[in-house]
Regions:
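Domain-level recognition of soluble alpha/beta enzyme cores
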Residues: 1-52, 64, 73-74
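Short substrate-entry loop that stabilizes the transition state in hydrolases
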Residues: 42-49, 54-91, 177-178, 207-209
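Glycine-rich His-Gly loop
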Residues: 54-58, 147, 173, 202
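Alpha/beta-hydrolase active-site loop
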Residues: 100-138
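Residue in the alpha/beta-hydrolase core beta-strand immediately N-terminal to the catalytic nucleophile
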Residues: 140-142, 167
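Gly/Ala-rich beta-loop-alpha elbow adjacent to hydrolase catalytic centers
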Residues: 145-149, 153
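Conserved hydrolase catalytic core segment
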Residues: 158-166
Length: 247
C-alpha cells in the first residue's frame, strides 16, 4: 500500500474559493497503469475506510497537515484536508475552516451548525468517481482540526449537523469565545458533545497565550483548552480525553 491523493473543488456560500485534497490508500502494483494519468487505483483491502476531515487553522495551508493525513491513511483511514478562502474580518481575506460567525453570538451559539464547509465538502467527496468511489464509509466520519479549525470542530459535535459524525478532535482549539462577539469576559461556551471528543494542547502554547486579549482583560491564569474540557463537554460517558503535550 502507498498513499496517494486526488484534488477537488467544492462550493461554499459567501466564500471566494474552496479546494480539498483527499488522501487514500493506493495499490502499489497499479503504478505502471497510472504512468500517463497519475491516478493510481485504490488498495481495496482495507475498505470501506472511515473518513477524517481536517479543518485548518487561520491562514494555515492545508499541506501543513499532509504528514498527519499520510499517517492516518497508513492506519486505515481516508483523509481530507482543505482550504476555504473567505473573510477574516478586519484582517482581510484568507484561509479559514469555514464558519458562520453569526452562529457564534451569545443568543444563538450551539443551537445549529456553524461549520459552513463541512456539508459541501462531504457532498463533493460523495460525488467522486474512481479511484475512491464506493470505498469510503460515510457512516464513520471524524472531524478535527488545529487552532480555529479545532474550535469549529468542537462547536459542531452533533451528528444531526455533520452527517455520519462519530467523533471529533482538536489541537490548540478551545471554546472560550471572543468578547467581540458579545460574550462575557473569559466565558467558555458549551458544545453539543454528542460524540466522543479528544482535546490536545501544548503545555506551553505561545499562540494561545498571545491571543488572551481577545477573551479577557484580567490577569488571571489563562488555560482555555483545559477549561473547555472541564466546562464545555457535558458528555459524562468516560469517552472524551484531554492530552497535554510537552512544549
Amino acid at each position: 500500500m502507498i498513499v496517494r491523493s486526488i484534488h477537488l473543488g467544492f462550493e461554499v456560500p459567501d466564500t471566494d474559493a474552496s479546494m480539498a485534497t483527499l488522501y487514500y490508500a493506493a495499490d502499489e502494483g497499479a503504478l505502471d497503469a497510472a504512468r500517463l494519468t497519475g491516478l493510481v487505483a485504490a488498495d481495496r483491502s482495507g475498505s470501506p475506510w472511515p473518513l477524517v476531515i481536517v479543518l485548518p487553522g487561520i491562514n494555515v495551508a492545508p499541506d501543513s497537515y499532509r504528514w498527519l493525513a499520510i499517517r492516518l491513511v497508513r492506519a486505515g483511514y481516508c483523509v481530507a484536508t482543505y482550504a476555504n478562502i473567505g473573510s477574516l474580518g478586519p484582517a482581510g481575506r484568507g484561509i479559514t475552516p469555514g464558519v458562520d460567525m453569526a452562529a457564534l453570538g451569545p443568543d444563538i451559539i450551539a443551537s445549529h451548525c456553524s461549520a459552513t464547509a463541512l456539508g459541501p465538502l462531504l457532498d463533493a467527496i460523495a460525488d467522486l468517481d474512481e479511484p475512491v468511489q464506493g470505498l469510503i464509509d460515510f457512516d464513520r466520519v471524524a472531524i478535527g482540526g488545529h487552532s480555529a479549525g479545532g474550535t469549529v470542530a468542537l462547536h459542531n459535535t452533533d451528528p444531526s449537523w455533520v452527517s455520519g459524525l462519530v467523533c471529533a478532535f482538536s489541537f490548540g482549539g478551545h471554546t472560550m469565545t471572543s468578547m467581540s462577539l458579545g460574550h462575557g469576559e473569559a466565558s467558555v461556551t458549551a458544545v453539543p458533545s454528542k460524540v466522543p471528543i479528544l482535546l490536545l494542547a501544548g503545555a506551553d502554547d505561545g499562540v494561545v497565550a498571545a491571543s488572551r486579549d481577545r477573551y479577557r482583560n484580567d490577569d488571571q491564569a489563562h488555560d482555555p483548552v483545559r477549561r473547555t474540557f472541564d466546562e464545555a463537554i457535558h458528555r459524562n460517558q468516560n469517552d472524551s480525553w484531554l492530552v497535554e503535550i510537552a512544549g
